[in-house]
Amino acid sequence: MPEADLSILNRVYDIILDRKENYDENSYVCKLLNHRKGMNKILEKVGEESIETILAVRNEDHREIVSESSDLIFHLLVLLAANNITLEEIADELSTRHEKMRRD
């Protein structure tokens, strides 16, 4: 299986960071980051997309799993950016865990 080009995650994350710094009233990301419910709105979206992903898996609907997983990952990126957590921190944590599993 060919390796996926995951640079899209960095590009999307960079756009989210830009929206965090530069408000645009037409931007969905800005609306999430500046919602009156604050972080709770982002948490609601992550929860909603998690449930929709679970349901897609339960229904064994490949296209829907891909679609809902994409929504979930997007909203997780918004959550990370809102909490000043970088993708590098996530990659480092995954690398550390991977190395630990290889040793065990």
UniProtKB/Swiss-Prot annotation:
Keywords: Amino-acid biosynthesis, ATP-binding, Cytoplasm, Histidine biosynthesis, Hydrolase, Nucleotide-binding. SUPFAM superfamilies: all-alpha NTP pyrophosphatases (SSF101386). Disulfide bonds: none annotated. Transmembrane segments: none annotated. Its EC number is 3.6.1.31. It is found in: Cytoplasm. One of its GO terms (cellular component) is cytoplasm. Its main location: cytoplasm. GO terms for biological process: L-histidine biosynthetic process. InterPro entries: HisE, PRib-ATP_PPHydrolase-like. Belongs to the PRA-PH family. HAMAP family: HisE (MF_01020). NCBIfam families: histidine_hisI (TIGR03188). This is Phosphoribosyl-ATP pyrophosphatase. It comes from Methanosarcina mazei (strain ATCC BAA-159 / DSM 3647 / Goe1 / Go1 / JCM 11833 / OCM 88) (Methanosarcina frisia). The gene is hisE.
